[in-house]
Amino acid sequence: MSTGIWVLIVIIAAVLGFVGGFFAARKYMEDYLKKNPPINEQMMRTMMIQMGQKPSEKKLHQMMNAMKNNYGKK
């Protein structure tokens, strides 16, 4: 086989590797963030107290559900 064909095969393999790696990393991060959200109810409660709001359970659940729904749409 000629050198040109080998170069073409290497370039195609590299592009496929980059594309596959990108999608695998993206899927891994989405799953990781679903299992370990960057903010939880206790953090939300603390933020609301610091802002001078009384954190009711209903309000906390509404905010957490809104965040989960927002993340799922991306």
From Swiss-Prot:
Domain of life: Bacteria
InterPro entries the record matches: UPF0154
Annotated transmembrane regions: 5-25
A Pfam family matched in the record: UPF0154
GO cellular component: plasma membrane
Membrane topology: Single-pass membrane protein
Cellular compartment(s): Cell membrane
Keywords: Cell membrane, Membrane, Transmembrane, Transmembrane helix
Main location: membrane
Membership in a protein family: Belongs to the UPF0154 family.
The name this protein goes by in its record: UPF0154 protein LSL_0542
